[in-house]
Amino acid sequence: MKAYVTSIGEATTDLCVWSLQRNGFDVELIQDKTTLWDKLNRIYNKADHDFVRVDADVVPNKMLTPQAVNLAGANISWWLQFQTFDWHKQSLTWGGVQFIRKEALPYLRDSVDKFSDKIRPETELTRIPQFYSPRRFESVPDVMGLHGYKATDLKRVKELKAMRNQSPNYDWELEERLNAL
């Protein structure tokens, strides 16, 4: 199964790629300074089979295998979002690991351009009618990796979370103390 890793140069990019390869994925790294929307657009227009998309700031654990994602969720789900342990929050969080079945691709290709100017285009795509009527998007509570560890651009991360009004969910003080160890 193909795994697309999207990166802007995160410190954990190589580790993310290695872990996915170790777990049995054929990995394609998309690493540049373009937006997530641009990367998603390229992936959706290139993919022709089921795939996973993983943020490069996620270090996948041994749970994230082609077999595990194929067995997760309901049979009618076209898009599964998994959990990770978030280093910034020091808690579980959704996202960072997405499994998309080929049945979703026509709808993603048709809709991705509508969200080119959105801060979170992938989240917006989960809300299109084809994914909720009937329900085709599913959040699966399986923890598939560690998100945010060894972030070297903490200022950018904090600014992004503030822009999304998510800062209260994060434990920046604990993260900074852990990083100082």
Question: What function would you assign to each model-found segment?
Answer:
Residues 80-95:
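Short beta-strand-to-loop element that shapes/binds the nucleotide-sugar donor at the catalytic cleft/hinge
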Residues 96-109:
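Conserved nucleotide-sugar donor-binding
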Residues 132-181:
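C-terminal catalytic/acceptor-binding lobe
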Residues 49-59:
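Short beta-strand-to-loop acidic/aromatic patch adjacent to the donor-nucleotide binding site
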Residues 15-27:
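Short, acidic, metal-binding catalytic loop of nucleotide-sugar glycosyltransferases
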Residues 115-141:
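A short, conserved alpha-helix in the catalytic core of glycosyltransferases
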Residues 41-50:
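Active-site nucleotide-sugar/metal-binding loop of Leloir-type enzymes
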